[in-house]
Curated annotation (Swiss-Prot):
This is UPF0122 protein CPF_1968. Might take part in the signal recognition particle (SRP) pathway. This is inferred from the conservation of its genetic proximity to ftsY/ffh. May be a regulatory protein. Coiled coil: none annotated. Gene3D superfamilies: Winged helix-like DNA-binding domain superfamily/Winged helix DNA-binding domain (1.10.10.10). InterPro entries: RNA_pol_sigma_r3/r4-like (IPR013324), UPF0122 (IPR007394), UPF0122_fam_protein (IPR054831), WH-like_DNA-bd_sf (IPR036388). It comes from Clostridium perfringens (strain ATCC 13124 / DSM 756 / JCM 1290 / NCIMB 6125 / NCTC 8237 / Type A). SUPFAM superfamilies: Sigma3 and sigma4 domains of RNA polymerase sigma factors. It holds the Pfam family UPF0122.
Length: 112
């Protein structure tokens, strides 16, 4: 299957666009690390049906991301945050508590 971390992130971003069954299967496979056989048993279906559903969902999630570009936007925000924090640490005599506060606020902006 595809990069587990990448798909897990796409599930976080676009999981609400999947059906409940699709979301549950994808979560079990990518986030809970259950095998195809275990998921098939839970859903009372075949291993092949679960495999096919996962492949379809991966394509669907990638399609959403190609159109909405949410993962690229979030990656860019994290890069900007890292650049800002590097500059703060390099050029500033700010107190560590203030740096931590700024870091937390930047994280809130990214996740808003």
């Amino acid at each position: 299957m595809e990069n587990r971390f990448e798909i897990s992130m796409l599930i976080d971003y676009y999981g609400t666009l999947l059906t409940e069954k699709q979301f549950n299967v994808m979560t079990l496979y990518y986030n809970e690390d259950l095998s195809l056989a275990e998921i098939a048993e839970i859903n009372k279906t075949s291993r092949q049906a679960i495999y096919d559903l996962i492949k379809r969902c991966c394509k669907q999630l990638h399609s959403y991301d190609e159109k909405l570009k949410l993962s690229k936007k979030i990656d860019k925000r994290y890069r900007i945050k890292e650049e800002l924090m590097a500059e703060l640490n390099k050029n500033s005599n700010l107190d560590e508590d203030i740096k931590k506060y700024i870091d937390e606020k930047l994280e809130e902006i990214i996740n808003a």
